[in-house]
Amino acid sequence: GCGGERDKKKRLTMGKIAKKYCRKIFVTDDNPRNENPKKIRNSIMKGCKKIAVEIGNRKKAIKIAIKELGPNEILLVAGKGHEKIQDYGNKIINFSDKKIIKEIIHKKKFSSKKNHYQNFLLKKVFDNNNLRNVNYNNVSINTKTIKKNDLFFAIRGKKTDGHKFAREAIKKGAIKSIISKKIKQLSKNKIIKVKNTFSSLNDLAKATRDSTSAQIIGITGSVGKTTLKNLIGFALKNYGKVYQSPHSYNNKFGVPLSLSNLKRNTEYGIFEIGMDKKGEIDNLSKIVKPETAIITNISGAHFKNFNTLTDIAKAKAEIIDNILDGGNIILNKDDKFFNFLSNKARKKKIKIISFSSKKKADIFLLKTRKVKNCYRLKIIVNKRIFYFDTMYSTNNFINNILACISVLSVLNLDLNKMGKKFINFTIPSGRGDIKMVNKFKKRFKFIDESYNANPLSMLSAIRNMNYYKRKNNSQKLVFLGDMLELGKKSKKFHKELSTLINRSDIDKVFVYGKYIRETFNSLVKNKKGKIFNNLKEAYDHFSKIVHNNDLLMVKGSNATGLNQFSKNIKKGQISAI
């Protein structure tokens, strides 16, 4: 409001300023004095018509504004905080903004209502009158994961239509099914009808992101995203409430689904962002809007849709465009695209934090040494020395440790707290976890890299075999599958693997797949194991040739079936190493 009999020119200006910075404005009376209150309000309204509501009664205006206030939003009640009266010229009213606000908040107790947050989010997304007390717990697009009071989105995918499962979701306890077409035998109070369920899921993700006060971290790169996400989540749990995207939920469905499940009390949110083609990271990071982003590395993981590594680097760099103002980008200084990525970040005025396991950087590895049953890493963080103990010493994992420490440093957290904590971190299954297994009436070391494969991760896994120590005369055996989605460069990349294998101390290489035969055919004779036609043949063969204390490593793209093969091997696991 504006006072009467005061500077009239400022009224329009106040309306314009409010419109620039606020999502909603309530224009009410200040001290009209002897002026017409309606005319004063009209002068302000001219500057902010589309998003302003005119309510002359100041108490009513404050009450409605508080009622509509969402989580983490600020309500500015301006003009009369210092006064205890309202002047209408011929009438003086006892009135205190402070007193009125305290009374309304005390009666409403909105901050402690569990369902206020969810209702606020749903009302931002859906134009629906049937949204009172929709106290949903989680958001799901898969009835296999539905629990009581979850919100189910019926998404149409390539293989199936979620609408087929909308009734099943309700039977399993879903509070609402979001649908875009009529479904028989589903009551109106159990549905929210929309034009497009996928768009609505994205809208809920955006509303959730815009309403959180959590520090949001986005991770992309060609290799190591999921392990790094888990590692950062593991570390941040020592400092506050953490939410991280589950599994490898990094595509156009997984990212908005993960964001929609971000809880109100979360302090740190960690999201993995993947891609298959140009523009995907841009679209997904626009939803995530990270304060801090990490690009782990650039490699030929997507040549099916890209011609060069530079094209892949440009696509990964899209995340930089969507880092919030004043945000940070954490980059691997050992990656050959470091300068390219850092140049883009500088142009965007994004702060760059570098890490390295080979050279000086903001955060870099100085030394690794074996200490009893673990490895002690001496790491320089912004010119200060810190020590961290871990169970793993492979280059991949050390890079993940460095990236994780970079995040902790950016957030100004006490690094000494993590000195001994990394020992308890377990690498996710299929991403380099090491187990001692009892299988085929033998006890041997099993290195599971079977979740996925691209040229960089494959070379790294092969290189790591040189660091694993033999016990007595044990064998080092490798079982490799195809690296998929490499397009025209597939033959070249598969053949190049043989150069590294031939120089390694791997004893025998076994393969299964179409493209990996290029690798096998280029191996020196004494390293050639066998080409398998199916996985049963592979299973039967390993049951005969694996001995006690041998090392067996399995790696290939997920679609090859090697991940399931590895799960069958690990059914007899004893313990992690």
Which residues does each predicted region cover?
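ATP-dependent carboxylate-amine ligase
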Residues: 1-132, 145-151, 157-164, 291, ...
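Short gly/ser/thr-rich secondary-structure transition/capping motifs
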Residues: 8, 59-60, 130-139, 199-202, ...
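Residue-level signal for inorganic ion chemistry
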Residues: 25, 77, 150, 169, ...
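Phosphate-binding loop of NTP-binding sites
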Residues: 109, 116-127, 198-333, 337-350, ...
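Short, basic phosphate-binding NTP loop
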Residues: 112-218, 227-238, 260, 387, ...
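Non-catalytic positions within long, well-ordered alpha-helices that form the structural scaffold/packing
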Residues: 166-171, 285-286, 502
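Short, polar loop motifs at secondary-structure junctions
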Residues: 177-185, 333-336, 357-358, 513-517, ...
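Acidic-glycine-rich active-site phosphate/pyrophosphate-binding loop
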Residues: 228-232, 367-386, 433-434
